[in-house]
Structures are given as structure tokens and as C-alpha cells.
Amino acid sequence: MATLQLLRAPLLCVLLWVFCAPGARAHDHGADVHHGSVGLDKSTVHDQEHIMEHLEGVIDQPEAEMSPQELQLHYFKMHDYDGNSLLDGLELSIAITHVHKEEGSEQAPVMSEDELVSIIDGVLRDDDKNNDGYIDYAEFAKSLQ
């Protein structure tokens, strides 16, 4: 259970990081979860270098000219694969597993399906304030505060 909470924080962080760094392009980068026991990890979302990697070729604005809020928005959009301005369980799953792979070493244990489901359920429970089964941008931004 503690492992799930630790992975949840990195998922949310990755999401925040993508939104906060210019030059990040839509890519399969995950989000960190960290919000109390479950949620977005602010440090990952604010990792400008990683976000810029993903926005390269997508955003022409220099990273120095982007506000943290602009970076957060780009990070969010980067993980919104279907373009509906909402993050669903599958999009959260992709973000989480991407972060798990990047942060772990080659010997990092594979996350089980049950662990992944538990993390996603925790993110939705803690951050989906209107209980619609999705994380919208307002909920995403609020979870990073």
C-alpha cells in the first residue's frame, strides 16, 4: 500500500511537470501522484527540463517566458490523448507507468495491475472533486497546490 502511495505522487508530479515546462511535446510521459496520501507530485510537474523535452517542436515560446501555470497547462494537455480536456483512468495509467519506468532503475519491479488500479482509484478519489470519473484541468491544478 505504501508503494502505491509513493507511485501516485510521482504520477501527479509528472503531470504537473509537463504543464510547467515549455517545449514539452505530447509524449508518453507519466505523471506522479502525491496529494496527501494520493495525488500529483509537484516536483515532477515543475521539472522544466523534462517538460521542455516533450514540448520541443510543439511550442515555440521559450521556457523562460512561460509561467508555471502555462507549463502546467501544457503538461495536462500532453497527457490528454483524446483531446477532451479531461484525464481519464487510461490517461492517468499511461502517465503513471511512464513515470515509474523513468524513475526506476532497470531492476525496478514491474508495477502490478492491482497496484496501478489502486493508485488511479486514489487519484480519482482525492482529486476528482465533482466525481465524474475524470480529472479536469481545474482539479489537476488544485491538486498541485
UniProtKB/Swiss-Prot annotation:
Domain EF-hand: 67-102, 115-145
Protein location: Endoplasmic reticulum-Golgi intermediate compartment; Endoplasmic reticulum; Golgi apparatus
Residues holding Ca(2+) 2: 128, 130, 132, 134, 139
Pfam families cross-referenced by the UniProt entry: EF-hand_7
Primary location class: endoplasmic reticulum
Annotated binding of Ca(2+) 1, by residue: 80, 82, 84, 91
Region forming the signal peptide: 1-26
Keywords (A to Z) from UniProt: Calcium, Endoplasmic reticulum, ER-Golgi transport, Golgi apparatus, Metal-binding, Phosphoprotein, Protein transport, Repeat, Signal, Transport
Keyword hit for Calcium: yes
Gene Ontology molecular functions: calcium ion binding
Gene Ontology biological-process annotations: carboxylic acid metabolic process; gene expression; protein transport; vesicle-mediated transport
Modified residues (Phosphoserine): 105
Domain of life where this protein originates: Eukaryota
One GO location term (cellular component): Golgi apparatus
InterPro entries with a match to the protein in the record: EF-hand-dom_pair, EF_Hand_1_Ca_BS, EF_hand_dom, ER-Golgi_Adhesion_Reg
PANTHER family, A to Z: MULTIPLE COAGULATION FACTOR DEFICIENCY PROTEIN 2 (PTHR23104:SF14), MULTIPLE COAGULATION FACTOR DEFICIENCY PROTEIN 2 NEURAL STEM CELL DERIVED NEURONAL SURVIVAL PROTEIN (PTHR23104)
Job of this protein: The MCFD2-LMAN1 complex forms a specific cargo receptor for the ER-to-Golgi transport of selected proteins.
Subunit comment: Interacts in a calcium-dependent manner with LMAN1.
Protein name in UniProt: Multiple coagulation factor deficiency protein 2 homolog
Organism of derivation: Mus musculus
Gene encoding the protein: Mcfd2
